[in-house]
C-alpha cells in the first residue's frame, strides 16, 4: 500500500519540550530554511525560544501531570504571550505542534502554505501525538499492528493495511458503539438475572413456607394417627381383657355350680351305700350312673398366646415406624442429590457397559439421519391458544383466539407450550423443525414439568430439568435453569435437534442446503425419559416438524420470517 501523504509540515517552530526533527527535502515538504516566511512565521521565529520556556514550565506544572491528553482542562493558545491575556485555544495543529486561538488560527485559514496542515481539537500535550522514534507527527494507523504511525513508519509497516487517523477513528468508534451495545445488553441480562434471582428468592420463601405448612399438617396427622393407633390398641387390649375375664368368670361360675352338684351326688352315694336291699341298691345306683355328668370344662384361657402375638405386632410396627422417622432427613437429602437418578446407573442395570459407550457424534446430515425419529405434537398438552394442524405436525400461536380443547391435567394453562407425544429415552434421536417468528423456543423437558403454574420454573427456559434454544429475531439464545446464554450463530429457519441420551448431549444445528452448522450444545444429566418441548411466546409464532425426507432449501435472504 502506498504511503499516505496526509500533511505537508511547514516551517513553523514547535512549542513542545521535545520538538520533532525536521523532515528531509525528499519528503516534498519545505524545510525550515527554504521558501519565504509569512509575517506569522517571522513572529514564530522571534518567539520560539520564549515559547519553548513556557512549554517547559507548563510540562513541569504538577497540576497538569497525569493528564497527558488534557482531558477536562482548558487548553490555552500558545501564541498569546501575555499570561494575563491568554485566550482559549480553538484548534491544534499537528504539523506545528501548537495550539491556536481564533485570532492566531487565521494564518492557517488564509495562507495557502499552511492550509495543508492537519488541524484537530485543542490538545494539552502534543508529546503523545508524534512518533517517539522519528519525532514526526502521527498521521496514520496500522490496522494489523493496531498502532498509530508517522510517515516514516510507513516503510517499516510495508504490506500492512494503513488508513488515516480519521478513518481509523471512525472504525474504532463504530467498534466502540458495538462494544457499548454488547456491554449494555450484557448489563441488561445481568440485571434481569438479578431480578429473576430476587424473584426466585421470594418464590423460595413462599415455597418453603408452603412446604413447612404441609409438613406441619402431615406430621400433625401422623401424630394424630399415632395417638389414634395407641387408643385403638389400648381399647383392643381392654376388650380382650374383658372378654378373657368374662370367659374365666363364666367357667368359674359353672365349676362352682358343678361343685355343689357333686356334693349332692356324694351325699346320694353315701345314702345308697347304706341300702341293705340288694334289688333297691342296684336299681337306684344304675339310675344314678346313667344320669351322672362326667364332662368337665377347660379351665385354661388362651389369652396369653394371643397377647404374645399382639405384642410382636406392636413391637415390629413401632420399630418400623421409628426407622421411617429416623430416615426422614436422609431420604430428603438423597432426594435432593442430582446424582440420585444418574441415568448411567439405570442404563448399566439393563445394558452392559461395552454396549453403551458413547459413539462419535455425527457431522453430516446423512450421518444424523441414521438416528431419525418421527415426533408429533401432543394435543393433550397444547395450550388453548395453540392451534395444531397437519396431523399434529404444525403448531401456531393464535392469541387471543382459544381452541375448544378439553381441560386435562396434562394441558399447559399459563405458558403457550406443547410437548411431543413421544418420549426420548436410552437411545440417540434426531429430528428437524422449522421456526417462524421471534420468540420461539425449541428444547427438551421432563414429564413432571408443572402444567398449571405461572412461575418461570413452569416454562422450558426456567428450570434445571429443561434445555431450550430461543430465536429472538436477531440471534439465538440458549436457556437452562433460567440462565440465558447469547449465541453468535446466524439465522436459520430449519433447526436440527440431536439427542444422545446415554452420552448426555443435546445439540442444535442450523440446517442449510449443503451444511450443518452447530448452534449450541448442552451437556445434560438426563434422569428420566424426556420430551421434545416447544414454547411459542408471541402471537403468530409457528413451528413445523419437518418430514426428514424433505431436502433443505437453498439459503434465502431472510431465513427466519413469519409463519406461512
Curated annotation (Swiss-Prot):
Catalytic activity: S-ubiquitinyl-[E2 ubiquitin-conjugating enzyme]-L-cysteine + [acceptor protein]-L-lysine = [E2 ubiquitin-conjugating enzyme]-L-cysteine + N(6)-ubiquitinyl-[acceptor protein]-L-lysine
Gene Ontology annotations for the cellular component aspect, listed alphabetically: cytoplasm; PML body
Keyword Transferase among UniProt keywords: yes
EC top class, as a word: transferase
PROSITE patterns noted in UniProt: B302_SPRY, ZF_BBOX
Zinc finger regions, B box-type: 72-122, 126-165
Annotated localization: Cytoplasm
Family (UniProt): Belongs to the TRIM/RBCC family.
Record function comment: E3 ubiquitin ligase that plays an essential role in the organization of autophagic response and ubiquitination upon lysosomal and phagosomal damages. Plays a role in the stress-induced biogenesis and degradation of protein aggresomes by regulating the p62-KEAP1-NRF2 signaling and particularly by modulating the ubiquitination levels and thus stability of NRF2. Acts as a scaffold protein and facilitates autophagic degradation of protein aggregates by interacting with p62/SQSTM, ATG16L1 and LC3B/MAP1LC3B.
Protein name, entry field: E3 ubiquitin-protein ligase TRIM16
Gene source species: Pongo abelii
Lineage: Eukaryota, Metazoa, Chordata, Craniata, Vertebrata
Amino acid at each position: 500500500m502506498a504511503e499516505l501523504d496526509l500533511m505537508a509540515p511547514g516551517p513553523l517552530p514547535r512549542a513542545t519540550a521535545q520538538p520533532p526533527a525536521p523532515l528531509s527535502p525528499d519528503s516534498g515538504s519545505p524545510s525550515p530554511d527554504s521558501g519565504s516566511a509569512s509575517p506569522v512565521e517571522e513572529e514564530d521565529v522571534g518567539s520560539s525560544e520564549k515559547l519553548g520556556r513556557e512549554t517547559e514550565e507548563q510540562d513541569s506544572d504538577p497540576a497538569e501531570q497525569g493528564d497527558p491528553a488534557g482531558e477536562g482542562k482548558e487548553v490555552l493558545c500558545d501564541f498569546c504571550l501575555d499570561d494575563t491575556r491568554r485566550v482559549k485555544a480553538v484548534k491544534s495543529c499537528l504539523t506545528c505542534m501548537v495550539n491556536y486561538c481564533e485570532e492566531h488560527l487565521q494564518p492557517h485559514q488564509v495562507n495557502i502554505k499552511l492550509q495543508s496542515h492537519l488541524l484537530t481539537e485543542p490538545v494539552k500535550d502534543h508529546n503523545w501525538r508524534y512518533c517517539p522514534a522519528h519525532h514526526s507527527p502521527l498521521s496514520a494507523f496500522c490496522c494489523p499492528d493496531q498502532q498509530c504511525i508517522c510517515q516514516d513508519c510507513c516503510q517499516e509497516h510495508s504490506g500492512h493495511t494503513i488508513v488515516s487517523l480519521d478513518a481509523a477513528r471512525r472504525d474504532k468508534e463504530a467498534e466502540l458503539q458495538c462494544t457499548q451495545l454488547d456491554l449494555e445488553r450484557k448489563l441488561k441480562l445481568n440485571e434481569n438475572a438479578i431480578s429473576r434471582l430476587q424473584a426466585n428468592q421470594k418464590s423460595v420463601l413462599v415455597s418453603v413456607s408452603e412446604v413447612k405448612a404441609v409438613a406441619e399438617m402431615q406430621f400433625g396427622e401422623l401424630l394424630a394417627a399415632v395417638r389414634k393407633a395407641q387408643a385403638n390398641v389400648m381399647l383392643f387390649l381392654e376388650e380382650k381383657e374383658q372378654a378373657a375375664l368374662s370367659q374365666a368368670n363364666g367357667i368359674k361360675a359353672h365349676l362352682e355350680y358343678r361343685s355343689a352338684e357333686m356334693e349332692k351326688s356324694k351325699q346320694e352315694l353315701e345314702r345308697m351305700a347304706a341300702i341293705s336291699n340288694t334289688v333297691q341298691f342296684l336299681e337306684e345306683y344304675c339310675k344314678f350312673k346313667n344320669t351322672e355328668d362326667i364332662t368337665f370344662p377347660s379351665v385354661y384361657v388362651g389369652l396369653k398366646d394371643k397377647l404374645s402375638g399382639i405384642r410382636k405386632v406392636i413391637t415390629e410396627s413401632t420399630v418400623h415406624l421409628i426407622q421411617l422417622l429416623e430416615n426422614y432427613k436422609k431420604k430428603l437429602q438423597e432426594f435432593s442429590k442430582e446424582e440420585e437418578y444418574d441415568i448411567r446407573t439405570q442404563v448399566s442395570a439393563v445394558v452392559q457397559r461395552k454396549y453403551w459407550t458413547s459413539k462419535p457424534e455425527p457431522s453430516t446430515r446423512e450421518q444424523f439421519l441414521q438416528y431419525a425419529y418421527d415426533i408429533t405434537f401432543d394435543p393433550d398438552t397444547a395450550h388453548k391458544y395453540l392451534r395444531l394442524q397437519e396431523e399434529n405436525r404444525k403448531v401456531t400461536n393464535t392469541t387471543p383466539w382459544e381452541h375448544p380443547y378439553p381441560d386435562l391435567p396434562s394441558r399447559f394453562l399459563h405458558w403457550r407450550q406443547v410437548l411431543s407425544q413421544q418420549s426420548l429415552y436410552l437411545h440417540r434421536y434426531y429430528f428437524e423443525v422449522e421456526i417462524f417468528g421471534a420468540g420461539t423456543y425449541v428444547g427438551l423437558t421432563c414429564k413432571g414439568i408443572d402444567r398449571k403454574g405461572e412461575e418461570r420454573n413452569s416454562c422450558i427456559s426456567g428450570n434445571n430439568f429443561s434445555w431450550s434454544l430461543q430465536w429472538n429475531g436477531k440471534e439465538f439464545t440458549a436457556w437452562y435453569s433460567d440462565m440465558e446464554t447469547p449465541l453468535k450463530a446466524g439465522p436459520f429457519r430449519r433447526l436440527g435437534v440431536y439427542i444422545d441420551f446415554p452420552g448426555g448431549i443435546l445439540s442444535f444445528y442450523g440446517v442449510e442446503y449443503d451444511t450443518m452448522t452447530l448452534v449450541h450444545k448442552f451437556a445434560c444429566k438426563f434422569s428420566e425419559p424426556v420430551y421434545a418441548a416447544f414454547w411459542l411466546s408471541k402471537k403468530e409464532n409457528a413451528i413445523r416438524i419437518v418430514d426428514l425426507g424433505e431436502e433443505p432449501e437453498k439459503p434465502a435472504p431472510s431465513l427466519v420470517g413469519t409463519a406461512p
